A protein has these predicted regions:
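Positively charged, aromatic-accented nucleic-acid-binding surfaces
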Residues: 148-163
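Basic nucleic-acid-binding alpha-helical/helix-turn surface characteristic of O6-alkylguanine DNA
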Residues: 1-114, 163
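Short Lys/Arg-enriched helix C-cap and helix-to-coil transition segments
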Residues: 131-138
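Short helix-start
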Residues: 140-143, 149
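Regulatory, non-catalytic segments
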Residues: 115-130
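Short amphipathic alpha-helical/adjacent loop interface patches that line ligand
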Residues: 59, 124, 152
Length: 163
């Protein structure tokens, strides 16, 4: 779904929209043109929402995803604090099909770095836009959860919501 590009910046240049989901409260943060961060950490959420089209659309799509009505996100993404090479790892994550999981080793191989399972794990652990970049679909070689950036404490009780 297209996002309008008529944006009025707030003082910080960032916009946010939060919503209650099946995983708890989530906040989408945008630079006015791209989704840059997805946050569960309510500590420090003292500011009020200042939504824009991107943050609103992110919450709309996440809501549809959690209700089972959406399997692939269509959002403009620019992960906060990520170099181009780090973003390539995230782009590979988006190719993992809905409802499937792969190992860190398989993820590394898919990214063209078959001997870099630890780097694959780091890419998952430092993902600033979890769910949209589906790091929850990447597991340890033994099939167990690794260091998921959204917080591995979320996954055992909410695995069915994260496909």
């Amino acid at each position: 779904m297209p996002i309008t590009d008529t944006i009025i910046y707030n003082r910080s240049g960032l916009f946010s929209q939060r919503a209650q989901t099946s995983l708890g409260w989530i906040r989408a943060i945008s630079d006015g043109q791209h989704l840059t961060y997805l946050d569960w950490n309510q500590t420090g959420w003292t500011n009020h929402d200042q939504p824009d089209d991107v943050s609103r659309e992110t919450i709309t799509q996440l809501t549809a995803y959690f209700h089972g009505d959406l399997r692939r996100f269509d959002l403009p993404l620019l992960p906060a604090g990520m170099s181009q090479s780090r973003r390539r790892w995230l782009d590979v994550m988006t190719t993992i099909p809905f409802g499937t999981t792969i190992s860190y080793a398989a993820f590394a191989a898919a990214a063209g770095h078959p001997r870099a399972a630890r780097a694959a794990g780091t890419a998952c652990a430092t993902n600033p836009i979890p769910i949209i970049y589906p790091c929850h679909r990447v597991l340890r070689g033994d099939g167990q959860l690794g260091n998921y950036s959204g917080g591995s404490h979320l996954l055992p009780t909410h695995q069915d919501n994260l496909q």
